[in-house]
Amino acid sequence: MLENLCTLPLSADLFTQVVHPSKPLLTVGLSNGRVETFRIPTNEDSDDDEDENSSITGGKGVIKSVWSTHRHKGSCRTLTYSTDGESLYSAGTDSIVKHFSPETGVVISKIGLPPVNSTSSQSDTPAILHTLSPQTLLLGTDSGSLYIFDLRENGSLNPKPVRKHVPHSDYISSLTPLPPSSESTSGFPKQWVSTGGATLAVTDLRHGIMATSEDQEDELLCSTVIPTGLGPKHMRNNAVLAVGTGGGVLTLWDRGAWDDQQERIYVAPGETKRDGESLDAIVRVPDELGWGKKAVVGVGDGTVKIVDLKRREVQTTFQHDEVEGVAALNFDYENRLISGGGRTVKVWAEAGSAQEDEEEEEEVVEADQGVKRPAGSDDSDDDDGSDSDSDRPKRERKKKRRKGNKKGKHGGPSVSFPGLD
């Protein structure tokens, strides 16, 4: 059973969110160009540990703002962490990529994107970022271009991309690295899958675009990889890619067979493709949770669906928002699910484990005073950029098709998972 631990209201529509790989930090990028980092309550935190920087939440914990700044003119489109969590990168509709500290928000380096093509003076517009390795940053754009940037020792950006590919004719909606081969010496991926428009493409760091799919006649909006356990017979260790579409269908692709999809799971279909709810976000369920081969999918009607990839069916559904679609999904380092969409972020965890954590916390008392130990948290200052709440550009929508205005069925604060309780 999943339980909503806390709810975070935002000052503008959420475009992107990321979580730190080893710390309880959540960073959001908003439609008004603001970027803000929050500290999520952990198992060691006290429910009474509140201060003036706390945000309104549920009864299980307090989310605190660590820093906030007006990072981009226009909207903040995308965020990504470095592989070690020491650096954060953002990109906005101002065609600028910024590198900054996750702890303080202070900018360390920044670059501008090159023109869309040789005949244009207009800069390309970023759509998505992904850190492939400690040395490589990928950036996909609205024009369908893919830029590869080298990263220096401290994570700083080199001003010029080392390579440029054009795998798609429409904006790049997702970037998913493929697991490295057994012969890999670095342990980091060298190939990745991108989606854009109605096609999927595979690109190699050294050799460029390796494969492009057939036209799928539906928008491909999000993707995640399942490294093992779902491949065809006699090839169970072959990776499988799950791709969410605009028509509410989750398609499965076997690694190496990139021409066309192999399986279809109807997650939020309609009577026709146009009636289906868009699948805008997806994340693989961590193996540590013991749920099996499952993925969590964020839907345009505001619902979140747990999909059993082996049984090819939706296992359960719960509600993130009554009106706005789910734009982002993550699991943090404590394997809690974080859903974001509209002007709300919610943190979810298994109800049983949350109750056990509370009981353990009650037992941790000072020997002399018999009181809970407070959990400390230091708030950091913003960088020197504009930080006025009045700086709010007009609301801007992503290019991807959205159906978030349709109301979904009401969902309670906790959700049962058959076979997972």
From Swiss-Prot:
Gene3D superfamilies: YVTN repeat-like/Quinoprotein amine dehydrogenase. Residues 44-53, 355-366, 378-388 have a biased composition (Acidic residues). Residues 39-58, 351-421 are annotated as: Disordered. Residues 395-410 have a biased composition (Basic residues). Keywords: Nucleus, Repeat, WD repeat. Belongs to the WD repeat WDR55 family. This is WD repeat-containing protein jip5. WD repeats lie at residues 9-48, 71-110, 120-159, 220-263, 277-317, 321-358. One of its GO terms (cellular component) is nucleolus. The keyword Repeat applies. It comes from Neurospora crassa (strain ATCC 24698 / 74-OR23-1A / CBS 708.71 / DSM 1257 / FGSC 987). It is found in: Nucleus, Nucleolus. Its main location: nucleus.
